């Protein structure tokens, strides 16, 4: 049985990076706060239940598909079914006709689903007329369900009957045990290695803390067509839940390392009712010491005594987006396409092992399209035409294509309002 979290760790960096965009001051083209003004923001994002993910061929597959395992002779000889079954399959090759003693014990399938949501709380402050500072963090919740099914015809008993007296005691005992292989046996072998809940994992807690600042300036290319630039450096601190090597189905809802990001956006006002622009973000992810179970070879269940501190060298992140914005007065809409990319991770440690298996499929990409509508009463409030200044926004985001990435579809509502401490 493969760890479902190995597949689900594709959520880790991407979820943390996308959630950061909900925070005040980090969303593209929101403008600076006047000096001394405080903005607060609350938001809620609900993700569509995750049952499929994009694989290395940009195809959607069930999350558990990578862990469909056929316990046939080839798989058992490779050692992926455990050392005992590997030894049994090897011995059987030397007894009788190999074509008649090839083990086929059945097929294991996993059906995995993950339900994720995030509530965001943040504050921003106009430190000067040219700079806004912000801080915020999501409160994340996750529920992962994993149903294990073991099916097929187990031929261990028939091989034992065919061998008859040729089978020595140890071989006979091994075949008898192999004939009893079922879900309960597999579950016991996993739990004996110290792994946590197999069928269900639930979490609720703070995500990664985001702090940063933003500045902005305008350049006028020609009369009546200015370009607005916004630049924002930020720091992401690993306060969220990171992948736990002892939990079989957990999701990394935080990065697990410090991330230093920079974002730049440009908007050009084409008409009084229409603007367009680009967004760029690049984050340098710093090395971190983490605990992992290091496989000796290609085994799926890694022994508890293989857990050790390793150096995690995460790949960096970038995002490139293009946006169209339209509307007038209090009501506006936007259409945005974005490419979210996380470069592959590396792990190194003091014990000998297959570190490349830990970082497999960590190079991810997700292309998304989103549509949003907002209501902004700030100018109406300044004209004393509205009682409360606020910005309410509703956003829907849909995946277009992906590489080793979640099939993220989400719906988000955010509300921003303002305080004047003066």
Show which residues each predicted segment covers:
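Short loop/turn motifs that connect adjacent beta-strands in outer-membrane beta-barrel proteins
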Residues: 27-38, 125-126, 130, 144-146, ...
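Transmembrane beta-strands of outer-membrane beta-barrel proteins
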Residues: 38-42, 133-135, 211, 227-233, ...
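Transmembrane beta-barrel domains of Gram-negative outer membranes and organellar outer membranes
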Residues: 29-229, 319, 350-356
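Short sequence motifs at beta-strands and strand-loop junctions characteristic
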Residues: 107-117, 198-207, 243, 254-258, ...
């Amino acid at each position: 049985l493969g760890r479902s979290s190995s597949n689900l760790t594709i959520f880790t960096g991407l979820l943390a990076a996308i959630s950061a965009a909900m925070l005040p001051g980090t969303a593209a083209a929101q403008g600076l706060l006047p000096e001394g003004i405080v903005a607060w923001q609350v938001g809620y994002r609900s993700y569509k239940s995750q049952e499929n993910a994009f694989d290395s061929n940009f195809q959607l597959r069930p999350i558990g598909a990578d862990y469909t395992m056929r316990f046939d002779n080839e798989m058992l000889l490779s050692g992926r079914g455990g050392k005992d079954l590997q030894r049994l399959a090897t011995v059987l090759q030397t007894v009788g006709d190999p074509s008649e003693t090839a083990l086929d014990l059945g097929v294991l399938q996993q059906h995995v689903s993950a339900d994720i949501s995030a509530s965001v709380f943040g504050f921003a402050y106009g430190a000067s007329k040219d700079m806004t500072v912000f801080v915020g963090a999501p409160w994340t919740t996750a529920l992962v369900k994993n149903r294990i099914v073991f099916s097929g015809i187990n031929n261990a008993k028939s091989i034992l009957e065919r061998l008859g007296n040729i089978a020595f005691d140890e071989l006979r005992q091994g075949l008898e045990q192999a004939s009893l292989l079922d879900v309960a046996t597999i579950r016991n072998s996993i739990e004996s290695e110290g792994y946590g809940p197999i069928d269900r994992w639930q979490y609720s807690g703070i995500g990664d803390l985001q702090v940063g600042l933003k500045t902005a300036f305008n350049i006028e290319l020609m009369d009546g067509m200015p370009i607005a630039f916004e630049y924002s450096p930020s720091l992401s601190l690993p306060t969220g839940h990171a992948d736990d090597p002892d939990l079989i189905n957990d999701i990394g809802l935080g990065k697990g390392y410090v991330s230093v990001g920079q974002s730049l956006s440009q908007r050009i006002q084409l008409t009084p009712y229409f603007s367009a622009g680009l967004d760029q973000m690049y984050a340098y992810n710093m090395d971190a010491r983490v605990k992992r179970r290091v496989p000796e070879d290609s085994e799926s269940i890694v022994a508890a005594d293989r857990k050790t501190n390793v150096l995690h060298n995460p790949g960096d992140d970038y995002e490139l987006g293009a946006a169209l914005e339209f509307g007038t007065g209090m009501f506006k809409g936007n259409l945005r396409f974005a490419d979210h990319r996380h470069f592959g991770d590396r792990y190194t440690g003091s014990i000998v092992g297959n570190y490349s298996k830990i970082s497999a499929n960590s190079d991810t990409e997700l292309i998304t399209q989103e549509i949003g509508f907002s209501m902004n009463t700030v100018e109406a409030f300044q004209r004393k035409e509205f009682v409360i200044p606020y910005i309410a926004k509703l956003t829907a985001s849909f995946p277009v294509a992906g590489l080793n990435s979640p099939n993220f579809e989400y719906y988000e509502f955010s509300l921003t309002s303002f305080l004047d401490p003066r």
